[in-house]
Amino acid sequence: PKIPRKDNPRSSFTEDEYKKLLKVARELADTGIKVRGIPLTMELYYFIVLVVHTFMRPTEGEIFNIKHQDIKELKNGESLEISCITGKTGTRVLNTTKDAVEMYDKLKKIHPDHKDSDYILFPQYKNRTTALKTVNRLFNYVLEEASLKINTQGKTLVPYSLRHYALRTRIRKSKGKINVFILAKNAGTSVSQLERFYINQMELSEDERKNLLIK
């Protein structure tokens, strides 16, 4: 007999947990503190917001691999168009929310002499494994200081939890009116994955589920 597959909810932030994470990240950046000799600056804050508002994976192949030359600022100022060349699901072009435009502008200001071929995040680390590990340490420090290592569901929060929070929030705030096919394509995932790990784990009304076109 076929054993039913049980899908566990992905580790994600609640709205309050995400706001607390941002608040503590800002406060720590203002203190000039160092974590194992590495300054914790507003660049970590920008990283957090960018993951949420680009729906990208916080991995070497995705957000840590993005260079300035991969980004096109759309004329309306409402979105960035990002070419993700080495993503988990292959090459894709994604569009961001307006908040990502603001964060990208701030990143350019803290790296005013950047070249098109430079990475947008922590470009001083040419080895992107080093960049990833460094950011993970800084992120974990913020989680500890904010008492957010474990979320309200008892799950461990990690950088990847930002992506899960982003997708859940986008679905929830749309009240079921978002086109899940476009969202899945933009996030480099599939509709079935959205259904299994996000929509089926969320409290949605029957009308919202119908709007999401989930069969």
Predicted regions and their residues:
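The DNA-recognition helices of helix-turn-helix-type DNA-binding domains
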Residues: 70, 165, 174, 190, ...
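Conserved tyrosine-mediated DNA breakage-rejoining catalytic core shared by Y-recombinases
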Residues: 17, 26, 64-109
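C-terminal catalytic core of Y-nucleophile DNA break-rejoin enzymes
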Residues: 7, 86-106, 117-141, 158
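Key DNA-contact positions within bacterial/archaeal DNA-binding proteins
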Residues: 61, 133, 192
